Amino acid sequence: MNVTSLFSFTSPAVKRLLGWKQGDEEEKWAEKAVDALVKKLKKKKGAMEELEKALSCPGQPSNCVTIPRSLDGRLQVSHRKGLPHVIYCRVWRWPDLQSHHELKPLECCEFPFGSKQKEVCINPYHYKRVESPVLPPVLVPRHSEYNPQHSLLAQFRNLGQNEPHMPLNATFPDSFQQPNSHPFPHSPNSSYPNSPGGSSSTYPHSPTSSDPGSPFQMPADTPPPAYLPPEDPMAQDGSQPMDTNMMAPPLPAEISRGDVQAVAYEEPKHWCSIVYYELNNRVGEAFHASSTSVLVDGFTDPSNNKNRFCLGLLSNVNRNSTIENTRRHIGKGVHLYYVGGEVYAECLSDSSIFVQSRNCNYHHGFHPTTVCKIPSGCSLKIFNNQEFAQLLAQSVNHGFETVYELTKMCTIRMSFVKGWGAEYHRQDVTSTPCWIEIHLHGPLQWLDKVLTQMGSPHNPISSVS
């Protein structure tokens, strides 16, 4: 049955446009979304014809089809608010679209959503879906002068407990700056301290580091750079096209290709696991994320939805009144999504969430243990596979311990409602009533394979390893 026959009371224009609707999108909601669009486009000469041309001839060039941009950039359709280009890309191209982070405008688009013009283009064929970048393999030297001092990945869940600093605090978007160009050094001559032409844009390392060749070392009292608020909080992912050929550093002259082992990144079955804590007590079983879009909320879900981790279902006999009250305020919680090799956290709760992500802190030039406050309605990129890949590729030439340090980057901590750090009376995440720990399986497994190739005290690197 043609989808247009389902709507006997809609206008001919709406019926025509619904003919190109993708089948999985909700029928009634799609009808209302298209009807709202038709009313706007009828006020513009030729706009309807241009949209129909784009939908009927997807491979042919088409012009922008624009509607006025609202104050908050969103469009309301039947009690649901969303970004207009996401709504219509979902209706006509990708029913499984979750977020604007999954879309990039084509170069031909004159009014892309991120440009903050008075008009925004909703032509679904002026956007493309973000693809996961292919990460180059890490080249691990077969011979090493380093003497590994650690065993392989132990219980990484406790890695951050001995940090000597009380975490600093930052608030999104106020404390964040929009990177002017590439978010980190991007040329062979501008990399890290202790390398030729090292840049000052570094990842400050814990002062307890004893490795003089560490690419992350920086005095503990070095102040962070001045921060400027970003131009557009909605587009605050700072993403730039990255030349993946630049990510693996050139091999030293004395090492030939035959002296290295290539270790490739592999996408795991579950991209992350999430563990819930109340104070310093783990509560319930770990949640393993198979979907790239996961909700962690304070409700109960008897249907056992694989895309939701419902904290309301979990019981704890040691729960006190502070924890009970905090749990009541988690509400819609946080939306985590993994797209294009990047992890985003969107705060759906009416209360803020607080995130400690070393990868995010590295990207923004913060101290590694900084805790970032994400207010309600905001989203922040909390992990980038490409940046992690570059750090890993550079770390293998600094020895086992430097690579092992990166395990800390693969665990993200997130507190609901209550913050912790220098600006709060709670100094550690284990003092917050309700928090989660996110373990990123892909980067962790990649590290594990690299460390295995590098050897351990029980398996020293040799010419026959």
UniProtKB/Swiss-Prot annotation:
Every MH2 domain range: 271-465
Name of the protein: Mothers against decapentaplegic homolog 1
Changes after translation: Phosphorylation of the C-terminal SVS motif by BMP type 1 receptor kinase activates SMAD1 by promoting dissociation from the receptor and trimerization with SMAD4. Phosphorylation by ERK2 MAP kinase in response to EGF or HGF prevents SMAD1 nuclear accumulation and transcriptional activity in response to BMP. Dephosphorylation, probably by PPM1A, induces its export from the nucleus to the cytoplasm. Dephosphorylation is inhibited by association with EGR1. Ubiquitinated by SMAD-specific E3 ubiquitin ligase SMURF1, leading to its degradation. Monoubiquitinated, leading to prevent DNA-binding. Deubiquitination by USP15 alleviates inhibition and promotes activation of TGF-beta target genes. Dephosphorylation, probably by PPM1A, induces its export from the nucleus to the cytoplasm. Phospho-SMAD1 is ubiquitinated by CHIP leading to disruption of the SMAD1-SMAD4 complex.
GO biological process: BMP signaling pathway; bone development; cardiac muscle cell proliferation; cartilage development; cell population proliferation; DNA-templated transcription; embryonic pattern specification; gamete generation
Keyword Zinc annotated: yes
Organism: Mus musculus (Mouse)
Region feature (L3 loop): 418-428
Residues where Zn(2+) binds: 64, 109, 121, 126
